[in-house]
């Protein structure tokens, strides 16, 4: 009662209020919404393409390029995802519903994208939501009348969200996208198996109880309860039955990637599977690496052809020879000592314990320090639960990559793209190694139905994954049994609270994907994706071409796989992204209602000027994959192998040759743009700076964008060259 009075609710109106809650506060479904904006006009798209062609002609001069570069996002969540629903509850201080229809309007008129996909978590998609989202995809794909200036292509899909408790049973997250809604699987296929409850989404059940503290928003919390109950009550499909023969309204699951690939084969649908967020240690067990998936159980080279190297959760490209734990031959872990570049969380747990040793004997303090280290190693990604009442600042910069560009939180280096390209599986003999030959992309992993948020750096709480309650009233405090004694975290997904305060310093507006496509049609974009003629950027629309110019059959673009004996020669062409004007273009203002425009775009849209940012340099990375079992990884990754200045130009052309080509080699390039302000752009964890976290909760000013200067960039897909 006192809680309600503190909110300004008097005793006299409480009975009326509760009657209202009982009669109208029951939870219900959230509809898919209605698309408001019409397709973009042919004239506006034609004008946009002319600007691209002008830059392209400058870079190619006498040589003609038959492709155009289109931009998209293949990682988008809506309110149909349980975590997305929870993060937008009133207690979080954000907006609320972000339905599937909003994604179409945002993509067209806020982000000005050419294509995107829906990727709600399969583990929380109900049968009705799956059917409704297919209808939205169909509606959103209705374009203008001219196929040459087709304005937007939308691909259906879902996210397979698997989290393990050990390196051996952790497979990670994968987006599954499809070309068409025809022949689409009848059900999304998730990873949640019987006896696991809702898995990682079990922690959201606590949020439903907040309706009693926020009676004016009672219905919204009840809607979350409805969604959780509905998902929980969907019957599991029987195992061992062909997907085509299962009932429409059961929940289908795949325990491993191999199971997922097999089920996709049963549907015979054209699909692409995209691993993502691999280095993001928010849920990933210590010691996890690409090694346990480079086999038929974890990889299908015909489907798993693209890798997301950048998202709103950070950069997953770079390998570093750092370790949060040492693995002994016995299988046990030990805590490594810190270095100048890396602070293991297990070590910092010991330092935190030392500050809680007042009144203890030296022997007892030492024992507790060692126990804190042991529990931190056992807790894996749930480090924060060893001392649940400790301030997040006490953990300092532990387990973070301190010199990576926009690093993912709790960085797992053996999950990086570079590590993946360096390893080989020799189970079939040294002359027939199995390797990853990914194309590189970037996307957002946005959870507010906002595809392509990286066009501008603004509104940190709306355009990134920053999370946290809006005031102390909503802050959930985990009580320690003894604040001065370490606790052993539970590691089953959904049983422990992740480190949501520290992670908010490692969230970004997200990346964007570019395709070299022969046109704007769905078939042409899909063909570019399948051919891996793609690249990713950290958000800005940098233009990038990377070609092998002396391949046996002529030029070979990024994503190619070539066998050749002569030294390879390459050419790189790049142009900086357009500097942005404030606000939104007239077309966006005229196409959406003021309310819709403000709700989705928050006052800013993709609105390019005529000026481009400078490309400072081109960095070439060379990786020579393992040629025998046990070959050390670090020497195989040369980052950067070459760095070539662009001499202060916004358009840059460089050529280079590898005169030391002597074994199978992988090459890709980074185009590095001039310094610009970015959300969480400065590595706040550097020892040279005052340590300060950028929190998603009220503990950092919600209007603070935590700007820091950084060099935005683009990553080409690799060119894979095998020595005969």
Q: What is each PLM-predicted segment?
A:
Residues 9-16:
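Sec-dependent signal peptide recognition
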Residues 27-91, 117-130, 134-135, 229-251, ...:
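C-terminal functional module detector
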Residues 134-280, 305-308, 312:
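Extended substrate/RNA-proximal surfaces in nucleic-acid metabolism proteins
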Residues 101, 105-108, 112, 189, ...:
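Short, intrinsically disordered, low-complexity segments enriched in Ser/Thr and Pro
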Residues 64-71, 76-80, 86-169:
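Active-site-adjacent structural elements in enzyme catalytic domains
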Residues 1-9:
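N-terminal secretory signal peptides that target proteins for export/translocation
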Residues 23-25:
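C-terminal motif of bacterial Sec signal peptides marking the signal peptidase cleavage site
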């Amino acid at each position: 009662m006192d809680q309600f009075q503190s909110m300004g609710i008097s005793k006299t109106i409480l009975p009326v209020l509760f009657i209202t809650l009982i009669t109208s506060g029951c939870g219900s479904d959230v509809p898919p919404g209605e698309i408001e904006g019409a397709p973009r006009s042919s004239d506006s798209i034609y004008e946009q393409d002319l600007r691209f062609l002008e830059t392209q002609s400058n870079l190619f001069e006498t040589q003609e390029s038959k492709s155009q570069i289109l931009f998209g996002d293949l990682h988008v969540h809506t309110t149909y995802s349980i975590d997305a629903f929870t993060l937008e509850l009133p207690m979080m201080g954000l907006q609320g519903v972000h339905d599937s229809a909003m994604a179409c309007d945002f993509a067209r008129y806020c982000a000005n994208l050419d294509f995107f996909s829906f990727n709600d978590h399969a583990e929380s998609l109900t049968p009705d939501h799956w059917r409704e989202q297919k209808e939205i995809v169909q509606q959103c794909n209705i374009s203008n009348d001219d196929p040459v200036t087709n304005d937007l292509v939308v691909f259906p899909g879902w996210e397979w969200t698997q989290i393990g408790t050990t390196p051996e049973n952790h497979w990670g997250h994968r987006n599954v996208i499809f070309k068409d809604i025809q022949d689409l699987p009848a059900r999304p296929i998730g990873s949640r198996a019987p006896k696991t409850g809702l898995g990682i989404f079990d922690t959201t059940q606590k949020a439903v109880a907040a309706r009693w503290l926020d009676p004016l928003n009672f219905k919204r919390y009840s809607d979350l309860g409805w969604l959780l109950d509905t998902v929980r009550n969907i019957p599991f499909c029987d195992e061992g039955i062909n997907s085509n023969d299962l009932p429409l309204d059961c929940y289908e699951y795949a325990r491993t990637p191999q199971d997922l690939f097999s089920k996709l084969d049963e549907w015979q649908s054209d699909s692409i599977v995209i691993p993502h967020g691999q280095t993001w240690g928010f849920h990933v067990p210590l010691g996890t690496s690409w090694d346990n998936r480079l086999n038929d159980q974890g990889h299908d080279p015909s489907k798993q052809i693209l890798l997301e190297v950048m998202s709103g959760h950070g950069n997953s490209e770079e390998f570093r020879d750092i370790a949060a734990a040492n693995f002994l031959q016995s299988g046990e872990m030990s805590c490594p000592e810190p270095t100048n570049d890396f602070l293991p969380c297990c070590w910092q747990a010991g330092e935190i314990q030392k500050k809680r040793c007042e009144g203890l004997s030296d022997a007892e303090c030492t024992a507790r320090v060692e126990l804190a280290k042991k529990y931190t190693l056992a807790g894996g990604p749930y480090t924060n639960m060893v001392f649940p009442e400790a301030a997040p600042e006490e953990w300092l910069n532990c387990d973070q990559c301190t010199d990576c560009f926009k690093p993912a939180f709790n960085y797992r280096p053996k999950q990086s793209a570079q590590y993946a390209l360096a390893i080989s599986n020799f189970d079939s003999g040294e002359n027939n190694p199995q390797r990853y030959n990914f194309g590189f992309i970037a996307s957002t992993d946005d959870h507010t139905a906002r595809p392509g948020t990286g066009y501008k750096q603004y509104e940190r709480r709306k355009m990134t994954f920053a999370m946290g309650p809006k005031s102390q009233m909503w802050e959930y405090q985990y009580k320690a049994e003894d604040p001065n004694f370490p606790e052993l975290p539970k590691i089953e997904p959904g049983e422990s609270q992740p480190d949501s305060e520290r992670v908010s310093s490692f969230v970004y507006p997200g990346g964007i994907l570019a395709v070299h496509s022969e046109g704007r049609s769905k078939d042409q974009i899909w063909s570019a994706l399948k051919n891996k003629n793609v690249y990713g950027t950290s958000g800005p629309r940098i233009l990038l071409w990377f070609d092998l110019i002396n391949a046996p059959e002529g030029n070979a673009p990024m994503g190619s796989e070539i066998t050749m004996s002569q030294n390879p020669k390459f050419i790189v062409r790049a142009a900086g992204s357009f500097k942005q004007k404030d606000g939104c273009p007239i077309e966006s203002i005229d196409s959406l209602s003021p309310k819709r425009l403000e709700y989705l775009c928050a006052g800013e849209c993709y609105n390019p000027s005529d000026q481009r940012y400078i490309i400072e340099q081109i960095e070439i990375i060379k990786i020579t994959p393992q040629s025998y079992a046990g070959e050390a990884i670090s020497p195989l990754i040369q980052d950067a192998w070459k760095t070539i200045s662009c001499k202060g130009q916004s358009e840059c052309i460089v050529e280079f040759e590898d005169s030391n080509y002597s074994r199978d080699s992988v090459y890709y390039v980074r185009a590095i743009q001039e310094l610009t302000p970015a959300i969480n752009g400065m590595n706040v964890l550097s020892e040279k700076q005052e340590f300060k976290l950028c929190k998603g909760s009220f503990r950092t000013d919600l209007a603070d964008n935590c700007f820091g200067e950084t060099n935005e960039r683009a990553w080409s897909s690799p060119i894979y060259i095998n020595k005969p």
